Amino acid sequence: MVFGLLKDIKNGEYRTIATPVEITTIVNDGHTALVQRGAGEKAGFADSAYEAAGAKLVDTMEEIYAQADFVTKVKELEPCEFPLLRKGQIIFTCIHPAAHPQKVQAILDSGCIAFTAEDSHRYGSPNCEAAGKQGALMGLESMLSINGGKGMFVSGLGGSPAMKVLILGGGTVGQAALSVLYALGARVTVMDINIGILRTLKRQYNEHIDTMMCTKENIAALLPQTDMVLNCVKWPKGCNDWLIDRPMLKLMGKGSVIVDISNDDNGA
């Protein structure tokens, strides 16, 4: 099989879906690896490292699409790539089909075989862990008074209480956010619909966090005392309900922060 690694062209995307380590494995398994020049540069992997791993460097994405049986990159396809798709060719990339119906149609029209990278991680994508931790830090930055927040210190100070944080969703994203906020001294409540997850987290943190079943009623009861909410729920596609609706936002105090890490279309 000919494996093709594309350089991501979406504005602001610096990741690569395959490092030289993965290329070494692919080549050692007897496959041919084509890598577009600069595919890993912004992620810290030089073209020379891919060559040393056994890859052949090519200049354009057109060459990758024309020669490769398996084509991969991080982010969804751009319109300029639609005409390059071939019947029977395997595409592995983020697609986010609910948000990009025109891209789904282009894939169907081409006859290629496409896998949604965002849904392929059995134990949760490393990106989920990174998003949870980074989301927690961005929330704390937004809490600064210079950014319009309450100006609270996350762990509190002598005579001043710690920040109260509500995490919606106890999966990979929520657990990553929890690890950061708990370590910094926030008073955290985690909500989920899975009682098993809540029990596990309660034991993991030696009963030093609060857990509740995730319902609109429970959320509404906590919002008036909550300084920051992190949405880590993967919302069902096509769902027309919300965990937090517009009237519920009025329950939160001025300067409170919401970090929508999941950021699904018509999300929670």
List each model region and its residues.
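An N-terminal-biased, well-structured beta-alpha scaffold segment characteristic
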Residues: 2-106
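Short acidic-hydrophobic, aromatic-tinged amphipathic segments that line or gate anion-handling sites
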Residues: 56-61, 115, 210-215
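Rossmann-like adenosine-cofactor binding region
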Residues: 207-268
